[in-house]
Amino acid sequence: MVNAKHDTFCYDSEGYQREIFDGNALFEAYKRAKKGSDWKPQVQRFEMTYLLELSRIQRELQEMTYEFLPSTQFVLNERGKTRVIRGEQIQDRIVKHTLCDEVLNPAVKNFLIYDNGASLVGKGIAFTRKRLLTHLRRYYAQHHSNDGYILLIDFSKYYDNIRHDILMELMKKYVTDEHSLWLLQKTVDRSKVDVSYMSDDEYENCLDILFNSLLYQEIDQRLLTGKKFMGKHLNIGDQVAQTAGIAYPIPIDNFVKIVKGVKFYGRYMDDSYAIHESKEFLEELLKGIVEIAGSLGITVNLKKTRICKLSDHWRFLQIQYSLTDTGRVIQKINPKRLTAMRRKMKKLAPKLTEKEFTDFFRSWFKNHYKIMSRYQRNNIETLFNQLKEVTLCSTQSDLQTEGS
């Protein structure tokens, strides 16, 4: 395909798209897939014959005969949530990098609202937080007051309840390449859930029932015979799932931004907010969102979804906010995040060198110090100085001193 920008190595410029079996695309995907995991034996073995392996992958993708390798599964506790994560082999990560970076992301990007900040180059959680601050300040500038409300929306088990049939219909609007759609369907099919334990009546209505992958882990494996599969659920940690996660609620975002004309609206994966001067308007907006979400097969968590006054203290993406009557936006870190960080520091200090521990702490501190009080900053810096004495280098030097 023609590269109008003549930038052979710049895949994120999106001046063109390459086929998923393009040799250059696979090589660049290989470099991205192994980044940060070169130390793993599996990756090192692949590197020894990577040209032969990439050639094989290229041929199998072109002939549509590629088969995914078995994945690993583990449970991750993060930010107070327990999630089931699946790890992919290096070959599968390369293939999914090519699919997402060369086809899905460029195809979907133009249909996303600007304030959708997840899993996109140049965006992220920091981008979404900055946009929220911008929206709050613009709201105050327009209304000269903090009298207003914010609707905070959360979905129940978002990735667990993404329906495969709806996702494929959505993607077919943006992607027309035969090979890409074949690979996407193959990827989605891997996420099907064995529900052989269900009765015929339960199986008939399973797509309309909230699915929880954590509870699913407790089911007796002997009941999972492979006779019935549910076309719902995506694996967290899968790059395709991340792209699907930002594209799946496009109908909701278009409803809020275009149909309802809400200017101060943003999204980060399954967390979103809408700011308006009328509480009644936000209540009606929520009803519309719940209806559209239901048609997509996802469920709004009404226990966590709430409407708050802008002048009250409310939390979004683990930070507490409040808009004062002078237009100042107060930000405070979630105390639970500080507690988790202190525990992590105590656990890692004996396992890291002093430089590694310092880099780890400073990178975290730089991102959070502005939303911490002086008391909180002093406390965590005191702990850091104390723990530096028990890092790996410090302990080894003490042992050498005692030995001499």
Predicted regions and their residues:
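Short, conserved non-catalytic motifs in the polymerase core
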Residues: 38-44, 69-94, 111-124, 195-246
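Conserved polymerase palm-domain catalytic core
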Residues: 141-269, 273-288, 373
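Active-site-proximal segment of RNA-dependent polymerases
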Residues: 3, 13-16, 103-163
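Amphipathic alpha-helical blocks
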Residues: 46-70
